[in-house]
Amino acid sequence: MNIMICDDQKDELENMKQIVLEYAAVHSELFLEVKCFSNPFDMLEEIGKSGAPDIALLDICMPGVLGTEIAREIKSKSEDSTDIIFLTTSSDFAVEAFALHANDYLKKPYTKERLLDTLD
C-alpha cells in the first residue's frame, strides 16, 4: 500500500511522516510505502511516474495551488481509487473537500490519535 503526504510546511510534513511510519510499523502486514513531498507539483510528477497512491494526505493551502486541485488530478489518474484525506487550518474547505469525495479531513492542529484513527 502506498501513502503520499504533501504539505508545504516542513515541520507538519515531518510530524505526519512520523505518525504514518508508526502506523506502518504497527500494521506491517499492509507493507506500507510512504513518500513525502513539500511541493505538490513534485508529488504529481511522482504520480505520473509511479502511479497514484492508495492514500493521499494533502494540505489544502499550499503556495501556487490548492490541495483540492491536486486531489482532482489524483482522482482523474486513479479512477477514484485513491483515498484522499485533507489537512487544513480552516473548515471553510470542508464542503469542497467532500464534493471531491474526500474520505476525511483533519483540522490543524490535529492529534496523533485523530490521524491514526483516520488511517484505520
Where are the language model's segments positioned?
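Two-component/phosphorelay signaling modules centered on CheY-like receiver
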Residues: 10-35
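Conserved Asp/Asn-Gly motif in the active-site loop of CheY-like receiver
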Residues: 34-42
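Residues immediately flanking
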Residues: 8, 40, 60
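Acidic di-acidic motifs
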Residues: 7-9, 89
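Conserved sequence signature across two-component system core domains
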Residues: 6-7, 37, 56
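CheY-like receiver
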Residues: 44-45, 50-120
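Non-catalytic signal-transmission and effector/linker regions of two-component phosphorelay proteins
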Residues: 1-4
